[in-house]
Each structure stands twice: as structure tokens, then as C-alpha cells.
Regions:
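Generic hydrophobic-segment detector
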Residues: 19-20, 49, 87-88
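Residues at secondary-structure transition points
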Residues: 29, 53, 85-89
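Catalytic donor-sugar/metal-binding loop of nucleotide-sugar-dependent glycosyltransferases
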Residues: 22-23, 30-32, 36-50, 56-77
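Active-site-adjacent helix/loop segment of glycosyltransferases
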Residues: 59-124
Length: 124
């Protein structure tokens, strides 16, 4: 995790700058905070997804339930190794999860709900 040197200016900004919070369509579940009642209402992650896209699916179900998702400007450090870009097996799992997501009723309904961004694509 990268950290700035503790200069007077860096410390001033650290304690006085407001953290930006923005509304988004989905968040990565590597660091997710969700109200328990929402988790239970939506029955958590769809276990049909293996390793990939379960966070997108859950986020879209949150949105379809009429709730909002916010992303705070914070940093989380993960020191684990990720080899999925080098592994054909992980690539296949990723593609299978994407195909499952893109063909799901949740994705179809969410695409109709979410507003397109200016270039015509959806913000998914």
C-alpha cells in the first residue's frame, strides 16, 4: 500500500480534505459494506457464480430493489497474489461468469433501469 511522506502539507490534507463519496452502479466485493437486512432481503451472493461477477450481480439486485450504492474515496490494501490473468482456468471461469451475468434477467432488467452514459454505453 503506497503512503505519502508525512510532510506538513500531506498531514494537513489528510485531516482536512473531505473524502469524496459518489453514487455508482456496482462495487467490487473485495471491500464491501452492506446492511444486514439488505443482505438477507436479497439472499446474499448468487452461488451460481464461481469466483467472478457475484459482486456485479449483487450490486445490480441492490439497484433493482430501489436502493443506492455509494463508493467512498478510500484505499484498501490487499497483499495477496492474483494470478487469474495468467491462468487459463481462471480466464475460463471469468468468461463463464460474464456469460451467465449477461444472459441473466437481473442484468437485462438493470440495463433497462440504468441511464446510459453520454457515449451511449451503460455504466456497467
Amino acid at each position: 500500500c503506497e503512503r505519502a511522506l508525512p510532510t506538513p502539507w500531506a498531514l494537513f490534507l489528510r485531516y482536512t480534505a473531505s473524502k469524496r463519496v459518489e453514487q455508482v452502479d456496482w462495487v467490487n466485493a473485495a471491500c464491501l459494506v452492506l446492511r444486514r437486512n439488505v443482505w438477507e432481503q436479497l439472499a446474499g451472493f448468487d452461488e451460481g457464480y464461481f469466483m467472478y461477477c457475484e459482486d456485479v450481480d449483487l450490486s445490480l439486485r441492490v439497484r433493482l430493489a430501489g436502493l443506492t450504492i455509494h463508493r467512498a474515496e478510500v484505499k484498501v490494501c490487499h497483499f495477496g497474489q492474483r494470478d487469474s490473468r495468467k491462468s487459463l482456468k481462471h480466464f475460463r471461469w471469468h468468461v463463464a461468469s460474464l456469460l451467465r451475468l449477461w444472459s441473466s434477467p437481473v442484468f437485462y432488467k438493470a440495463c433497462r433501469l440504468l441511464q446510459p452514459i453520454p457515449d451511449g454505453r451503460h455504466r456497467i
